[in-house]
């Protein structure tokens, strides 16, 4: 075979292989991205964030420092004791996060949507679980958070902010007074972002008796109890309980 013909044949074959490799590479990238968008939720759930903030810093794959967190303190606004709210903020600042507070009873849905969309992660503080869910549904924040978590935005929940992710929050009656702040609230459907029921503050003062009663009365549910020193970390479909039990 003449030299020029062999050279031409080599160029054609090389081009075909190069195109095939390029298409295969792009196919893998698209498939991975599509799957990631569907399933890669990132959720960090705890009872007392100030006690487990270090766990978050060690388990996230991307650095937190310099990111902005949408901080929702709404569950606490009618509570007598709220020190945990400031403790949570201080723990976030210690991780290098910038806080954008959004008390959802003071904003309309469009404003809340913009803040949640602009921030890098979402933090929902503790307080009354039923009041929090009532205001989530009233403002549309429940749907906004489900949308953001579905897109892979990191969600950090503390206490009530943890329990609202369950399929239903009626089991929280053992811990929170649902009649005092929400006398007309009777839709106990949770966000349903998770398919289990976290029992926060398990065997932790002053909720020792309340959490034990939940374990006894709701043994038919897939409960996951966590103490103040533990956290539930979810990546996609993988779930891990981290930290030490008290």
Label each residue range with its predicted role.
Residues 130, 162-165, 231-233:
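Short, active-site-adjacent cap segments at secondary-structure transitions
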Residues 47-49, 230-231, 235-246:
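Patatin-like phospholipase A catalytic core
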Residues 69, 122, 159, 198, ...:
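A residue-level signal for conserved active-site and pocket-lining positions in enzyme catalytic cores
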Residues 77, 127-130, 161, 203:
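Short glycine-rich anion-binding loops that position phosphate/pyrophosphate groups of nucleotides
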Residues 1-28, 32-33:
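Bacterial Sec-dependent N-terminal signal peptides
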Residues 189-194, 198-235:
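Conserved anion/nucleotide-ligand pocket segment
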Residues 34-121, 125:
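N-terminal beta1-alpha1 cap of cysteine-dependent amidohydrolase-like domains
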Residues 82, 134-135, 141-204:
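Class I SAM-dependent methyltransferase SAM-binding "motif I" and its flanking Rossmann-like core
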């Amino acid at each position: 075979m003449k030299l020029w013909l062999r050279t031409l044949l080599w160029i054609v074959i090389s081009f075909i292989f190069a195109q095939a490799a390029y298409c295969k590479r792009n196919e893998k990238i698209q498939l991975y991205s599509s799957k990631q968008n569907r399933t890669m939720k990132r959720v960090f759930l705890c009872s007392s964030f100030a006690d487990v903030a270090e766990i978050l810093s060690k388990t996230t794959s991307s650095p937190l420092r310099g990111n902005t967190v949408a901080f929702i303190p709404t569950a606490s606004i009618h509570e007598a004791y709220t020190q945990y709210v400031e403790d949570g903020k201080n723990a976030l600042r210690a991780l290098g996060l910038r806080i954008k507070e959004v008390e959802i009873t003071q904003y309309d849905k469009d404003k809340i949507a913009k803040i949640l969309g602009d921030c890098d992660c979402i933090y929902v503080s503790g307080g009354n679980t039923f009041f929090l869910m009532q205001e989530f549904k009233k403002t549309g924040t429940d749907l906004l958070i489900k949308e953001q978590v579905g897109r892979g935005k990191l969600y950090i929940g503390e206490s009530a902010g943890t329990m609202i992710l369950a399929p239903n929050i009626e089991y929280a009656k053992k811990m929170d007074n649902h009649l005092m702040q929400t006398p007309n609230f009777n839709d106990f459907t949770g966000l349903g972002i998770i398919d289990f029921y976290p029992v926060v503050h398990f065997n932790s003062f002053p909720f020792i008796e309340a959490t034990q009663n939940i374990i006894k009365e709701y043994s038919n549910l897939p409960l996951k109890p966590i103490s103040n020193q533990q956290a539930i970390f979810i990546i996609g479909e993988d779930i891990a309980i981290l930290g030490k039990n008290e």
